[in-house]
Amino acid sequence: IRNLRAAIQNPQDYTARSNLMWAATMAENRLIKLGKRTDFECHQMEHQLGAYINCNHGEGLAVLHPVYYRHIYKYGLPKFKRFATEVWGVSADGRTDEEIAFAGVEALADFIKEIGLPTTLRELGVIRQTDLKKIADTVAIVPGSYKQMSHEEILEIFKECY
């Protein structure tokens, strides 16, 4: 987060850009995920979205992740609480674990807006809300996610993102 903010502020900041590339490499090769429970369902949702509207994967995830996380954070509460406190610096003082986790999801949504990424499916090129069911029905539902989604729940997430 710190490096992305620095790189946006100064695109010539070689250290910030190098650190971003290293972090992206670690995230993409899945080395840091070994032995840990992860959730890939939002990526499955975005793959289908991208197939229909040809959007950039990262921009699609920027739109989907906050809404998706609002639907699942209670099912992965320890990890979402840690995400909130460690990544976003959310204070635990006087808050329940659920409140802390939710504050982290909202911090992510705020950050996405701060850096100028799209926040709605309309911004990505989804013209008609009626297209959402067709897209949702083609999403592969993968095992191992914090909450097993149905196609109806995926459609609801798409509608909230519209």
Model-derived features: where do they sit?
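Active-site segments that bind and position negatively charged phosphate/pyrophosphate groups
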Residues: 1-106
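C-terminal charged capping/lid subdomain of soluble metabolic enzymes
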Residues: 91-162
